[in-house]
Amino acid sequence: MSSSVSSKTRYWVLALAAIVLDQWSKWAVLSSFQYRERVNVIPSFFDLTLVYNPGAAFSFLADQGGWQKYFFLVLAVAVSAYLVRAILRDEFATLGKTGAAMIIGGALGNVIDRLIHGHVVDFLLFYWQNWFYPAFNIADSFICVGAVLAVLDNIVHRKTQEEKY
């Protein structure tokens, strides 16, 4: 078991790095911006801003009555626990474990926000003319990239399994 745990250290380091990067970036924005303040980074395309999101990634369910805070808190912890178990049991190949670690780090980064602030801190705002993508944060990015890696791992693994038969 100890060799199994030590071989997985890189995934725990990745998850921790995601949490640290996410929390540091949010601290920097909270320390430097007023609520809804915007600073243009790339004209007509990308701003830094400070907004609060009581919903999920990309403001999903943000306009609900408050129940979603607890729902997404429990969901993030449950998904993270499942993914930790899956990594420990080698249920994924390397790409899937990397994706799972990224999802864990992103999910727990947003859990920390919900516990400390009662909402998630978002600050990355992409737009084009009158079209705005919902503001998001580093944790959301880790979750999305991790999900893509997990899906790719599943596709590759499934194809490999089919080739065996």
From Swiss-Prot:
The active site is at D122, D140. Its EC number is 3.4.23.36. It holds the Pfam family Peptidase_A8. Keywords: Aspartyl protease, Cell inner membrane, Cell membrane, Hydrolase, Membrane, Protease, Transmembrane, Transmembrane helix. It catalyses: Release of signal peptides from bacterial membrane prolipoproteins. Hydrolyzes -Xaa-Yaa-Zaa-|-(S,diacylglyceryl)Cys-, in which Xaa is hydrophobic (preferably Leu), and Yaa (Ala or Ser) and Zaa (Gly or Ala) have small, neutral side chains. It is a multi-pass membrane protein. It is found in: Cell inner membrane. Pathway: Protein modification; lipoprotein biosynthesis (signal peptide cleavage). It comes from the Bacteria. The chain crosses the membrane at residues 11-31, 41-61, 64-84, 92-112, 132-152. GO terms for cellular component: plasma membrane. GO terms for molecular function: aspartic-type endopeptidase activity; endopeptidase activity. InterPro entries: Peptidase_A8 (IPR001872). One of its GO terms (biological process) is proteolysis. This protein specifically catalyzes the removal of signal peptides from prolipoproteins. Belongs to the peptidase A8 family. This is Lipoprotein signal peptidase. It comes from Neisseria meningitidis serogroup B (strain ATCC BAA-335 / MC58). The lineage of its organism: Bacteria, Pseudomonadati, Pseudomonadota, Betaproteobacteria, Neisseriales. The gene is lspA.
